[in-house]
């Protein structure tokens, strides 16, 4: 359970300075009308609910350390990408949850941020293969002309957001 994981991390390391919520499962590539409740639940439970539960359980530790939360969301909800209804719904929920947490937890010194990386991941590779025209259109709208590199681009942003420089 989430409570046990967070408690174990706090006991093992003596504190929790940073919480990064990045896990997400979904049935990308499935149109809205073809989604089942199980498909939708997969995205909501693995993304939005997981983020909520980890944030809730980690808050006492983060409050004590004046730590940081970095939640991963996506442009999928912002831009309405085909075949990503449940994924987009979960990620938009995470963005809203994060905004509320930033307002509520900021006075306690806890920094809450959202990263919407559009990084080249296995899930995005699948989407690229299933929607090549949409992929090409998306690339044209990115100033660098490419998706982010998970380590070089996204990882460095997370390191900064977890640092005192971002507070």
Regions found by a protein language model. Give the residues of each.
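Substrate-binding pocket helix/loop in short-chain dehydrogenase/reductase
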Residues: 2, 30-32, 36-41, 138
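C-terminal substrate-recognition "lid" of short-chain dehydrogenase/reductases
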Residues: 13, 61, 147-167
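Active-site loop-to-helix junction immediately N-terminal to the catalytic Tyr of the SDR YXXXK motif
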Residues: 35, 80-88, 100
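Active-site helix of classical SDR
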Residues: 55, 90, 98
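Alpha-helical segment proximal to the catalytic Tyr-Lys
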Residues: 60, 103-107, 167
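Residue(s) in the substrate-gating loop at a strand-loop-helix junction
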Residues: 74
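Catalytic Tyr-x(3-8)-Lys segment
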Residues: 132-152
């Amino acid at each position: 359970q989430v409570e046990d994981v967070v408690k174990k991390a706090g006991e093992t390391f003596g504190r929790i300075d940073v919480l990064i919520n990045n896990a997400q499962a979904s049935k990308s590539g499935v149109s809205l009308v073809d989604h089942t409740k199980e498909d939708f639940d997969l995205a909501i439970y693995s993304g939005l609910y997981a983020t909520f539960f980890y944030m809730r359980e980690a808050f006492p530790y983060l409050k004590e350390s004046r730590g940081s939360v970095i939640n991963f969301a996506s442009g999928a909800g912002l831009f309405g990408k085909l075949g990503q209804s449940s994924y987009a719904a979960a990620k938009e929920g995470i963005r809203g949850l994060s905004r509320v947490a930033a307002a509520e937890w900021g006075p306690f010194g806890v920094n809450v941020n959202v990263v919407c990386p559009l990084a080249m991941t296995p899930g995005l590779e699948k989407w690229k293969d299933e929607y090549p025209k949409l992929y090409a259109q998306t690339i044209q709208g990115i100033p660098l002309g490419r998706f982010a590199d998970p380590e070089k681009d996204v990882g460095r942003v997370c390191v900064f957001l977890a640092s005192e420089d971002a507070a």
